[in-house]
Amino acid sequence: MKKTLFALLTGLFICLGITQVAHADDYLRIGMEAAYAPFNWTQEDDSNGAVKIDGTNQYANGYDVQIAKKVAEDLGKKPLIVKTSWNGLIPALTSGKIDMIIAGMSPTAERKKEVAFSNSYYTSEPVMLVRRDGNYANATSLDDFKDAKVTSQQGVYLYSLISQLKGAKQETAMGDFAQMRQALESGVIDAYVSERPEALTAESANSKFKMIQFKKGFEVG
């Protein structure tokens, strides 16, 4: 069965496409982390158009969820979010557990062997998130992170960008952005590489955080 991956390519573009539905019922099952605000997150009720997360009493919301609802409607289906870890998304799709993915993912040649990518719906850029009272709060360039302990999410292109930070210490990649925020606040890391929407969300939610955006930033692709 042909699968189409709905991929949110963070930093470059977000992809969308239509898939053959793997399940012969009333639901369109969409895989996502539900942990990458403002695109997708987990909440405790169905307020503001949230969609039920399969197998739980929780709900997912965000830009990706709203798009998923529209796609499901166009296909005559009801949306059902399947909360899935990052590394489990493609296996869930290829095994038929889900019908599509909406998640931050680069369309690499290796991934294209298993899934198909659609056109984008959003363009973003990589930035840094630091502590407002930390040693790197006044950074203005990629060269200002000497000795900084920096990480990003496991399996995403953002982690590979750390090598462009001159003198930075590349820490072990982390599972999700909630984990990185906690590590940053506690001082385990000095910064992490993110995308502008996520960093803005983190900065707005926690006054201890500061987003660093560069005039001459990371080279991507």
Predicted segments, located by residue:
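Positively charged n-region of N-terminal signal peptides that target proteins for export
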Residues: 1-5
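Bacterial N-terminal signal peptides
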Residues: 7-17
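Sec/Tat signal peptide C-region and signal peptidase I cleavage site
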Residues: 18-24
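Extracytoplasmic small-molecule ligand-binding "clamshell" domains
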Residues: 25-104, 113
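Residues embedded in well-ordered beta-strands
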Residues: 29, 127-129, 221
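Bilobed "Venus flytrap"/periplasmic-binding protein-like clamshell domains
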Residues: 34-37, 57-73, 105-106, 127-176, ...
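Short helix-initiation/N-cap motifs at beta->coil->alpha
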Residues: 63-65, 80-91, 137, 172-186, ...
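Acidic, polar ligand-binding/catalytic clefts
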Residues: 73, 78-144, 207-211, 215-216
